[in-house]
A protein has these predicted regions:
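Surface-exposed binding/hinge segments that line
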Residues: 102, 111-112, 117-174
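Aromatic- and charge-enriched surface segment that lines or borders ligand/interaction sites
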Residues: 71-119, 272-274
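Extracellular/periplasmic solute-recognition and catalytic clefts
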Residues: 188-196, 215-269, 393
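Extracytoplasmic/peripheral linker and loop segments enriched in polar/acidic and small residues
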Residues: 10, 16, 373-382, 407-475, ...
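Gly/Pro-rich hinge or "lid" segments in bacterial periplasmic/extracellular proteins
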Residues: 60, 139, 149, 154-213, ...
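N-terminal lobe/hinge region of extracytoplasmic solute-binding protein
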Residues: 26-77, 108
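Append "and occasionally in soluble cytosolic enzymes with long acidic Gly/Pro-rich linkers
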Residues: 274-363, 449, 504-507
Length: 509
């Protein structure tokens, strides 16, 4: 496989080093987890692109894998044995050499971390799943250093998507030490509302990192955020803003995202939502048109539409009469009296958007005799609270980490570390396993069959395919390009000489 080698650069653009002293980003207020093994939010992944690097990294435009800590690799004839040749000039920020043993340490640390959402992606490696589940030793995991700069990895089955997978921050190379980084920047200062990154002088490609410093500020104050952007003290705004007060409308970057927002049931023995018939009743009664009103791209399925991916039957119609019949049947299956009250709990982030959507469901489900209790959780705590929350229904917005249906379907694999729903289906898992052995048309056909099983089991309510929203003046900033993952590697950013001037506004430098 030939990977892209050229760094992102703007054609014939001369970069002025005098402008690169500081680049200011405002991001949403959040308890940021900057451990690449346990980070789950896309906003965390964005920062991690500047702090850590793995064998591959994202091309900032195409998102194809670029060589990072490797300079080449080869794959055996049976496609199961991968040999990676590491760069011999790569160092950690403390000046120590990065070797194949560091990759082994990093991946084994990821696999054995119970809080690592992405660790099950490495189950494709011999011995990894057993080690993750505590059923086998680390020595049996087929990640082996041949020498200081050669790494051998043995897979259970072919996985042509492996380089794309290894672009993700979770598979970065880390050192067993505090504040040591493998990427283009290091953390210089950190407070509750600010993180300052400094250029990593020991980074192997430091000469192509233009910014000397990046200041990350965290704020959900839309008026203040917009004001600071308007006067030029902020270079990139990716938090809340006031569109009416935004002076430079050309700065609004709105693009389709490889993502889906959906609600899902958590399967718990003590919950009535473990009953399939009741879940089917709730989905039959859902007013899909109202639920998807005022969204950019309505979603009726989980997987974002991809070329070559067969259509599956999603959720598009409402039938309250059928829903009422199903509720009666569900009560019999649950051994409840016909007059028994049915209550389920929906835990949501405390945002105006989600409160409105939850009220739509509450009203609709009340008409079929089901009471929906709505519980709010602070937005910045929501994702981490799901595993320990006793609610029945939750909301998720998932951005695919690589361009394959598996990026979504892995969320519901029975033993996946990303499966927070606790739904399990052996036929579904088997189809995912078979798809890993297949390519192209057959691969997609198997995965679409798996998705149909998931949808038929009424475990989720697809709502929308979100769009990414960023405020950034591309006449003033280079190295930034819209893409389907809304990931913009910090390494490539730089300030341009030209900057749009807005009448009657003093631009602060």
């Amino acid at each position: 496989m030939l990977l892209l080698q050229n760094l992102y650069s703007e054609e014939n653009y001369s970069i002025n080093p005098d402008l690169q002293d500081n680049f200011v980003i405002i991001s949403a207020l959040h308890n940021y987890d900057l451990n690449p093994h346990t980070a789950s939010y896309s906003a965390e992944a964005q920062i991690l692109t500047g702090l850590y690097e793995g064998l591959f990294s994202y091309d900032p435009i195409t998102l194809d894998p670029l060589y990072a800590l490797v300079k080449s690799y080869r794959v055996s004839r049976d496609k199961k044995r991968w040999t990676f040749i590491l760069r011999d000039d790569a160092k950690f920020s403390d000046g120590s050499q990065i070797t194949a043993k560091d990759v082994v340490y990093s991946w084994l640390s990821l696999i054995q971390n119970p809080d690592a959402s992405y660790s099950s992606f490495l189950d494709i490696i011999h011995g990894a799943k057993e080690f993750r589940l505590g059923e086998g030793p680390a020595e049996n995991v087929a990640i082996m250093p041949v020498d200081d700069y050669t790494l051998s990895v043995h897979l259970i089955s072919p996985a042509s998507h492996l380089p794309k997978l290894l672009c993700m921050p979770a598979f970065s190379v880390v050192k067993n030490a505090e504040n040591v980084f493998s990427g283009p920047f290091v953390i210089s200062e950190r407070t509750n509302d600010t993180i300052i990154l400094k250029k990593n002088s020991n980074y192997y490609d430091a000469e192509h990192v233009n910014l000397k410093q990046i200041t990350l500020k965290f704020s959900n104050d839309e008026l203040e955020n917009t004001y600071n952007y308007n006067i030029g003290t902020v270079d990139w705004l990716c938090s809340t803003f006031n569109n009416e007060k935004l002076l430079s409308k050309d700065s609004l970057q709105l693009y389709a995202e490889f993502a889906t927002q959906y609600y899902f049931f958590k399967i718990r023995k003590e919950s009535i939502c473990s009953n399939l018939t009741l879940r089917q009743a709730l989905l039959e009664a859902t007013p899909w048109e109202a639920l998807r009103e005022n969204v950019y791209v309505p979603a009726s399925t989980l997987v974002y539409p991809l070329n070559g991916y067969p259509l599956v039957q999603g959720y598009i119609y409402t039938d309250k009469n059928e829903a009422k019949l199903l509720v009666s049947q569900a009560k019999k299956e649950l051994q409840l009296q016909e007059q028994s009250e049915l209550k389920i709990k929906f835990a949501i982030p405390d945002t105006e958007y989600m409160i409105k959507k939850a009220e739509i469901l509450k009203e609709a489900w009340n008409e079929i005799g089901v009471t929906l209790e709505i519980s709010t959780i602070p937005d910045y705590e929501y994702l981490s609270s799901i595993s320990k929350c006793d609610a029945d229904l939750f909301t998720y917005t998932w951005i695919g980490d690589f361009a394959d249906p598996l990026a979504f379907l892995e969320l519901f694999r029975g033993n996946s570390t990303m499966n927070v729903s606790d739904w399990k289906n052996s036929e579904y898992d088997s189809l995912l396993d078979k798809a890993a052995l297949s390519t192209d048309e057959e691969h997609n056909k198997l995965l679409s069959s798996a998705e149909q099983i998931l949808l038929d089991d009424a475990i989720l309510l697809p709502v929308q395919h979100p769009v990414s929203v960023n405020i950034i003046n591309l006449n003033a900033v280079g190295g930034w390009a819209a893409n389907a993952f809304d990931i913009h590697p910090l390494k490539y950013l730089f300030k341009k000489e030209t900057k749009d001037m807005i009448p009657n506004i003093v631009m602060l430098k």
